[in-house]
Design a protein with these regions (language model features):
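Active/binding-pocket-proximal capping segment
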Residues: 322, 336-343, 375, 379, ...
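Long, highly charged low-complexity segments enriched in Glu/Asp and Lys/Arg with interspersed Ser/Thr
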Residues: 434-461
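Hydrophobic, well-ordered secondary-structure elements that form the walls
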Residues: 322, 369, 430
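Extended, regular secondary-structure scaffolds
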Residues: 125-230
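Extended, helix-rich architectural segments
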Residues: 1-141, 145, 460-463
Length: 463
């Protein structure tokens, strides 16, 4: 994607905002090369040219690509454990208006996409705008199509922009957006392009903060917009994997056709063998007469076949290092011990690091989702966030258990809790723990209410 804008030349754009927008463009452009590199490693598109040590792999094979899914695994396995399930208040009750916003924006399905982008590049962004049909429109954006400036004093973004129109397939990334939203504390500036000319339209709002919220993974004081899961040590281990698999592949080729030798033959016999190498390799018989010049009998032999075991051992070592660096289990990165299979309890113990990381991810993303929910409610009701009532302000994001225990385990725990705590079996939490989805729970509650209604009618009729 190409983004070429001179902010001061945009028709109708405030000069102060044009200066901040230029800073945003500088930030966005400075991150594009690194983001593109992380995208390549996520997609497994790593060529031998960038990993070759120049010892065992010929330079001519630099363009060869070896597939590696470790970059994808680093992101997707953790993202799969962050399962957003909607919003509830502190009493555990849902908000009908907020449920409608979640459903209309398909947030439960869109969140995993935003989470993967967040883990891949360090952050992703949610933007909000008023919508006459559904009240509030919520969209998620990758760091490749959005950028923001951080306000350290307020602990949130100062301003940001997001590309609104969808990217088109063009050669060499030549596509240029034609619609960009620029978000400030008091307005959304809509920047639209007609040919090579840009114009700006200001849409004021009363939120008092940009209608843009980042989802940030593992932020630090020096990196408020977080860090990618595909960081430098991870990329180096992926390079080691690609290099080792390439060496193993080449070694296997030589093992398939081990080197042979034939001594004491005439020049004619030598030429015949050299000119028909493949035929001599696959043939069942190799015949040669005594050398009439020397009287020697030809001697045939084969050098020791290559061994692929060192390459396999190296892959296991790399997988173990990768597991430690990423928090994934060694099973996730492809190391399986068939001779002594890992028990389910051992696998669960190995995944505790990943579960802890998922809980931390849910906590930080939960705060961002709560802010998004409050802004969405405020936009829908035409008020500021400060004007929301206390019940609305108590909204929190709900996530499923990142440990992903089996239904049998959670059901057993639920039954034990119900036996010790009176009334627990009547709650929605109990039904969730024994394996029912929110849709099933609603159907169960509706049918229970219908049954109670029929019973009440029967009592009235009998009396």
């Amino acid at each position: 994607m190409q983004l070429i804008i001179e902010p001061t030349a945009v028709n109708g754009f405030d000069l102060r905002e044009a200066d901040r927008f230029r800073k945003l463009l500088t930030v966005w452009q400075s991150k594009q090369s690194k983001n593109a590199e992380k995208e390549r490693y996520y997609d497994g598109k790593v060529s031998l040219g960038e990993v070759n040590l120049g010892v065992a792999i010929p330079i001519g094979m630099a363009g060869l690509e070896i597939g590696c899914a470790w970059g994808t695994k680093t992101v997707d396995v953790l993202a799969a454990r962050s399962m957003f399930d909607g919003f509830v208040d502190l009493d555990g009750e849902s908000n009908d208006q907020l449920d409608a916003i979640v459903a209309n924006n398909n947030l439960v399905a869109e969140y995993p996409k935003a989470c993967r982008e967040e883990l891949k590049l360090g952050c992703s962004f949610a933007t909000l705008s008023a919508d006459p049909d559904i009240g509030c429109k919520i969209r998620f954006h990758s760091a490749q199509t959005a950028a923001a400036l951080w306000d350290g004093e307020k602990g949130r973004i100062e301003c940001g922009f997001a590309v609104i129109d969808a990217a088109q397939d063009t050669p060499m990334g030549e596509w240029m957006p034609s619609l960009i939203n620029y978000y400030t504390d008091d307005a959304i500036w809509v920047l639209s392009r007609d040919g090579s000319m840009w114009s700006a339209t200001r849409l004021p709002h009363i939120m008092g903060r940009p209608l843009m919220e980042p989802l940030i993974y593992n932020p630090t004081a020096s990196k408020p917009f977080g860090q990618s899961r595909i960081k430098e040590p991870i990329r180096r281990l992926i390079q080691g994997y690609v290099r080792t698999v390439a060496n193993a592949t080449i070694g296997l080729e030589f093992s398939t056709a081990p080197q042979k030798y034939l001594l004491g033959v005439t020049d004619e016999q030598f030429d015949a063998v050299v000119n028909q190498k493949f035929r001599q390799y696959i043939g069942n018989m190799l015949a040669a007469t005594t050398n009439p010049e020397t009287g020697e009998k030809p001697t045939f032999g084969q050098l020791q076949q290559g061994n692929i075991t060192p390459h396999v051992d190296m892959l296991r070592m790399l997988a173990t290092q990768f597991s430690a660096a990423s928090g994934l289990t060694v099973t996730d990165v492809g190391v399986v011990n068939d001779a002594n299979p890992t028990s389910s309890d051992a696998i669960l113990a190995q995944s505790q690091t990943l579960v802890a990381m998922a809980e931390q991810l849910n906590e930080s993303n939960g705060d961002a989702l709560r802010t998004i929910a409050l802004m969405a409610l405020a936009i829908t009701n035409g008020v500021s966030m400060d004007e929301l009532n206390d019940d609305q302000k108590q909204t929190v994001a709900h996530f499923k258990n990142p440990a992903m225990p089996s239904v049998a385990v959670t059901a057993d725990a639920a039954i034990k809790i119900a036996s010790a705590r009176e009334g627990f079996a009547e709650t929605d939490t109990f039904l969730e723990m024994i394996g029912f989805s929110q849709t099933d729970i609603r159907r169960i509650r509706a049918q229970e209410q219908r049954t109670r209604g029929f019973d009440l009618i029967s009592e009235i009729e009998s009396s």
